[in-house]
């Protein structure tokens, strides 16, 4: 019981020290940019499409160990990720148009 109390006091002291240095605890976390996250999501969509295309080419060339059900599953995953990306883009465009039509 006493240990938990001491840990609480220590964390409060650390928070006070951070405030004294004019930096908050939230400032120590890395910043995540919207553009970076969007770029990463587009890269993941591209990667799934490339992987599905490669898998389909391997199956077409008759490489051993490549099953039709795996190829179809990868192609569907690729299609679903692309459709999700398109829907996100549509929502972003709609939000942008709505913001632009607002009066200041």
Curated annotation (Swiss-Prot):
InterPro entries: FliE (IPR001624). GO terms for cellular component: bacterial-type flagellum basal body. Its main location: other. Keywords: Bacterial flagellum. GO terms for biological process: bacterial-type flagellum-dependent cell motility. Belongs to the FliE family. This is Flagellar hook-basal body complex protein FliE. It comes from Enterobacter sp. (strain 638).
């Amino acid at each position: 019981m006493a240990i938990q109390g001491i840990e609480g006091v220590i964390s409060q002291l650390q928070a006070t020290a951070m405030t004294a240095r004019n930096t908050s605890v939230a400032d120590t976390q890395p910043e995540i940019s919207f553009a970076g996250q969007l770029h990463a999501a587009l890269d993941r969509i591209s990667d799934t499409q490339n992987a599905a295309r490669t898998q389909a080419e391997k199956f077409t060339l008759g490489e051993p160990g490549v099953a039709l059900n795996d190829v179809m599953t990868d192609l569907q995953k690729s299609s679903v990720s692309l459709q999700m990306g398109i829907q996100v883009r549509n929502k972003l465009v709609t939000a942008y148009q709505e913001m632009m039509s607002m009066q200041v």
